[in-house]
Amino acid sequence: MKKVKVQDAVGLTLCHDITAMRDGFKGAAFKRGHVIEEGDVEKLLDLGKRTVFIWEENAGEIHEEDAARRMAAVAQVEGCHYTEPSEGKVLLMADTRGMFRVDTALLNQVNSIGDLTISTLPDHFPVEAGDRLASMRIVPLVTQETQILEAERLCQGKKLLDLRPYHPRKTGVIITGSEIYTGRIKDKFEPVVRAKLAHYPGEILGVTICDDDLNMIVDTAKGYLAQGADFLIFTGGMSVDPDDLTPTAIRQLGAEIITHGVPAQPGNMTLVAYLGDVPILGVPGAAISMPTTIFDVLLPQIYAGDRLTHEDLIRLGDGGLCRLCKPCHFPTCTFGRY
């Protein structure tokens, strides 16, 4: 790579994109590989470019675009594609819906290699097809190939980035509470749960309202399991009051309760359990009064096939406080980012 005055660069090949910013536009005015013409000189000067870099290949060096392609190659993600390099960077784009995962420890290692930079959406972020997930580039126009080789070594056999698509689930919904069962109070959980599950593939096998009767709750859950349910949602009866039977019913099913209570608000009293491979969520009343609770944070992980651990749920504390923005713009916010 050689630096030359623009007046002396006519007939030479540009080795980098040159960016223009004007009237809301930001993009490449000149692309790498462009052969500079007489008419380009004034345009380059207007962009503040008195000098440009002309490509001269040196052993052991790698150009920014080639480096970006090599960086993308170490982080191939099924269900995604990379753009062609532009202005020295490549973008990872989602081709499907799902939950984006990042090996943050490995990402920090790669970003500690000299000139390499990879920026991503947060780990556990729910994404839609067409979303931009990551950007990769080196800081200078060229770098030593040894830096790329080190990134390739670190990432070999590992998943730096991943997109886990949502899988269909058959869900049984069990609403508990004598006040609802007897008709004294109108149920408000069903429309909320249906609206939230509508964002994910699968079907709701049914919604059953149960009295505060342990056997009724357990038998209803067993009935859904017999129909092939692979996800159970319980609402109501999630507090620590002695007559709140939902946690007891879940235990009586034979499920392992991972936690009853999470360090996140709204939704502190959320219960997470597993009966074999069947996830079970106990959803507290905050889901009725708040547009977003920890229920919304956990659903993408369940539909993406993650098995939630106690450690996962403890980590919710950092980012677990909803700011109660009006209007709510979850998930493009701080809530549930861990």
Language model region names:
Residues 54-55, 80-85, 143-145, 203-207, ...:
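Flexible, glycine/charged-enriched surface loops at secondary-structure junctions
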Residues 7-11, 22, 28, 82-85, ...:
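Solvent-exposed alpha-helices and their adjacent loops that cap or buttress functional pockets
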Residues 31, 37, 122, 126-129, ...:
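Residue-level recognition of short, solvent-exposed, well-ordered loop/turn junctions
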Residues 157-212, 216-218:
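Glycine-rich phosphate/diphosphate-binding loop of Rossmann-like nucleotide-binding domains
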Residues 58-166:
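Extended, charged alpha/beta regions that create polyanion-binding interfaces
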Residues 32, 84, 99-118, 125-128, ...:
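C-terminal terminal segments
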